[in-house]
Amino acid sequence: MKAGLTRRQVLDRTEKRAFVEFLADVFGSTSMVVVTQNKGLTVADVTELRRRIRAAGATYKVAKNRLASRALDGTQFDGIAPLLKGPTALAWSEDPASVAKVIVEFAKTNDKLVVLGGALGSQALGVDGIKALAELPSLDELRAKLVGMINTPATRIAGVVQAPAGQLARVFGAYAKAGEAEAA
């Protein structure tokens, strides 16, 4: 073990191999990866960032660059390997917009988190690409809009179909009242 490091800070070969396999599985099953530089973030900052990312259904992991590069080899995200320099962390999610939104919003309020880039599928994205992705609505927002658009015509048709029946009922009601008034 290296001098000055605790057992927890040094990974043995089997742990490294398991971590590379874990990341390779993640990169094989996710649609979006964002690479950030987290130099100078406090524990409280990282905890808050992880909480926000978890709430968005994403994951944030600090990884050794060499191990992350090995995990990237042969995956659709291997184009982001050059971004892995310095103290970096990876965030990933199935919903591309959600992870990008959380990272970009957090970076606006905390200048110690720097977005380096990322990838959406096999397409490598720069900082501007990640920021543009953050402007898009999330999958849940898109689903809600789609359901609303699908329901709107049905609601209008139901309103049109019900309107004549209501009008007829009012006309019959008026005739009935008029007939009662004449009979009295």
Curated annotation (Swiss-Prot):
Keywords (A to Z) from UniProt: Ribonucleoprotein, Ribosomal protein, RNA-binding, rRNA-binding
What are its GO biological-process terms?
Answer: translation
Q: How does it assemble?
A: Part of the ribosomal stalk of the 50S ribosomal subunit. The N-terminus interacts with L11 and the large rRNA to form the base of the stalk. The C-terminus forms an elongated spine to which L12 dimers bind in a sequential fashion forming a multimeric L10(L12)X complex.
Give the family this protein belongs to, as stated in its UniProt record: Belongs to the universal ribosomal protein uL10 family.
What does the protein in this record do? Forms part of the ribosomal stalk, playing a central role in the interaction of the ribosome with GTP-bound translation factors.
Output the Gene3D superfamilies linked to this UniProt entry. Answer: 3.30.70.1730, 6.10.250.290
The entry's cellular-component GO terms read: ribonucleoprotein complex; ribosome
Q: What is the lineage of its organism?
A: Bacteria, Pseudomonadati, Pseudomonadota, Alphaproteobacteria, Acetobacterales
PANTHER family, alphabetized = 39S RIBOSOMAL PROTEIN L10, MITOCHONDRIAL
Query: By its UniProt entry, which HAMAP family does this protein fall under?
Result: Ribosomal_uL10 (MF_00362)
Pfam families tied to this protein:
Ribosomal_L10
The answer on whether this UniProt entry bears the keyword rRNA-binding reads: yes
Which CDD domains does this chain map to? Ribosomal_L10
GO MF terms listed in the record are:
large ribosomal subunit rRNA binding
Q: What is the recorded name of this protein?
A: Large ribosomal subunit protein uL10
Domain of life per record: Bacteria
